[in-house]
Amino acid sequence: MAFSAPVLRAFSQPTFTYVIKFPYNNWKEDEHLLWSLLAPGTESLMIQLKNCAPHPEDDPIREDILCSLADLHYGAVFAKACYIATSTLMGQKQRTLFPRCDIVCQSEIGSDFLHCHILVGGAGLSKRNAKISRATLLGLVMAELTQRCKLLLAHRPFEPAEATIYHELKRIEREAWSGHTGNWVQILQYKDKRGDLHAQPIDPLRFLKHYILPKNRLISPSSKPDVCTSPDNWFILADKTYSHTIINGLPLLERNRKAYLQELESEVIPGPSAMAFGGRGAWEQLPEVGEQRLITSNTSTAYKANKKEKLMLNLLDKCDELNLLVYEDLVSACPDLLLMLEGQPGGARLIEQVLGMHHIKVCAKHTALSFLFHLHPDQLLTSSNKALKLLLIQGYNPLQVGHAICCVLNKQMGKQNTICFYGPASTGKTNFAKAIVQGVRLYGCVNHLNKGFVFNDCRQRLIIWWEECLMHQDWVEPAKCILGGTECRIDVKHKDSVLLQQTPVIISTNHDIYSVVGGNTVSHVHAAPLKERVLQLNFMKQLPQTFGEISPSEIAELLQWCFNEYDCTLAGFKQKWNLDKVPNSFPIGDLCPTHSQDFTLHENGFCSDCGGYLPHSADDSVYTDVASETTSGDYDPGNLGDTDGEDSKSEASEVDYCPPKKRRVISATPPNSPVSGPSLSTFLDTWQSQPRDDDELRIYEEQASQFQKNTKSTSEREEAQLGESQEPQPEPDPTAWGEKLGVCSSQQPGQPPIVLYCFEDLRPSDEDEGENIGGD
């Protein structure tokens, strides 16, 4: 083109825009002070400009004055100071004296302040540090202005009013270097969804086209734009003005503004004709949009979560996937995710909110019983279960108790929403209650010490544990609602009261919970309604110290067996156990005949009716007759029963003497004997599911074949014994009978028979062997 203007066809990115105000409020009234401080020698020209006529009238004096004031007025000096300061700032960012950047500075006379627009783009300036750089930029601009003011001191000292402006500039400079900008520098910002402000990058060429260039010139508030702007360079529709413009260190003259604007519109920035408008021009009629298109285009955009929300959602998914219920579970399962969320503002509070949301989700989805089965799936009840053993020791039917616990935990027991384990110390009540609540895991505890907020920990829980329960008149009324499963509002510390839904309660205590204590009085008014809400089990037998703790999996085994076998509702419980109503004191168990509550007899399993252990079954084939293996070398004269003979034992030993058993177990068990392998109950407990691999399949086939061989050998042995017993035996003659009686005939004729031994020494025969075993 025919002009030499500082045309920008490309601008460095990213680009940000600043606005710097001149820090003097009464600058319009004291405009002459700015003339003398920043542009000395231009006072007379500015006064003459006030008296010039506006265009379209021809005024040669006006043209000469405007040419003389080209870049010497205080607006131009202010724009130069801003450019030098911005260039210095970019040099610091890029660590060079000659930074590679693009800078546009335009000073303007506003309604309140003299200000300067700065467009700067280049490496070293980013979205993160552009906002922080405001104080540095303001300090550099104020330093340039104070240096400009000091040039006047070479000719004359400051007037008092001039000194006031100078000291104000120095004060703003000191505050800027300390980080305080006041309201003297601003940057274009945007607000995010959280309300935080961030630096807004801009399109510099479009900003030049639409905001910087289409303005008329005004160099003094006492003049007018039609005086300071020539008719050829007048923007008809522009209502804003500028004072001076600098692009990359060169002034943009008034006569070149329109040409530069036209070049930006036609060549640099694509216009509407080049866009995808179907070939229509900028002023042509746009296509009509139908109603259906408006409806379809009125769809809401997808919400994009920020970093904090994504972390919270990930943590909530982890809690649901891994069943994380408390802070300790988060530390052990996902510490990396926990640390990232802790690093966010208010991270501890966010973690509490996530856990609270997960608790609400679990309570809405599960009951205490279903969540217990969710945590402990596919449990098989065995006769070595400690929960089964404890209930049998205390005299209860463990299956009936398990049925009742299932109904309570599943919220199907009607008004009886509480199970109370009552008894003295060391009877297993806390052991049993702790196993139940730890199996559920999401439980709350009642705290007597915090008297104002006793049930503070009971909200958003699947089950409540009331350890060492004690009724007091301060909390007996809400306690009756909670024990009966009625919804009520409870007080929570530092929060409003919350609604407590029906939550099963487990109590372990050695106090009388039906007596209400208040001050120095004990009341029994609430005893009847409390008993209607509580199902009490009395544990009165102390357990040995070697009993051990009941694990949550053992509780899950018992409850899962009862849940699969019985109808876990109030009607099903009463129908199964033939009850008209469920009493407050749980009924004692009634064992079947020959069934025992002794844990030493647990190998054969338990009864599915009374819960007792099944009796032992013995096999006579593993025993043999001792008399058949006794020889004369093993003869013991003490077994004769003769008190006159010599005996080394004392009378006390004779009194306590118990004859030896006539049967004994064979020391070496035959390999085909049923006792040589595991029992049938042990085999069934071991192979309750299919083998998981080839090794387990091989072991299963070996044990199964061994059981088949044992069964076959036992049947063959029984048949052989039966056949031997049915064979005809020859009738013994008198001589044979005499030999059996210990009488032999004499070798010499006429002599009496010889008696070999006394009848007292005769061993019992096979016929009376069973009568003498274990008897005297």
UniProtKB/Swiss-Prot annotation:
Motif segment (RCR-2): 115-117
Domain PV NS1-Nuc, residue spans: 11-271
Reaction(s) catalysed by this chain's protein: ATP + H2O = ADP + phosphate + H(+)
EC numbers: 3.1.21.-, 3.6.4.12
Name of a matching Pfam family: HBoV_NS1-like_N
Subcellular location: Host nucleus
Keyword Hydrolase attached: yes
Region (Ori-binding): 193-197
One BP annotation, GO: DNA replication
GO-annotated cellular components: host cell nucleus
Broad class of where this protein is predominantly found: host cell
Broadest EC class assigned to this enzyme: hydrolase
Job of this protein: Multifunctional protein which displays endonuclease and helicase activities required for initiating and directing viral DNA replication. Also plays a role in viral packaging and transactivation of several promoters. Binds site-specifically to 2-3 approximate tandem copies within the origins of replication (Ori), unwinds this hairpin region and nicks one DNA strand thereby initiating the rolling circle replication (RCR). Becomes covalently attached to the 5' end of the nick and provides a 3'OH for priming DNA synthesis.
Protein name: Initiator protein NS1
Source organism of the structure: Human bocavirus 4 (HBoV4)
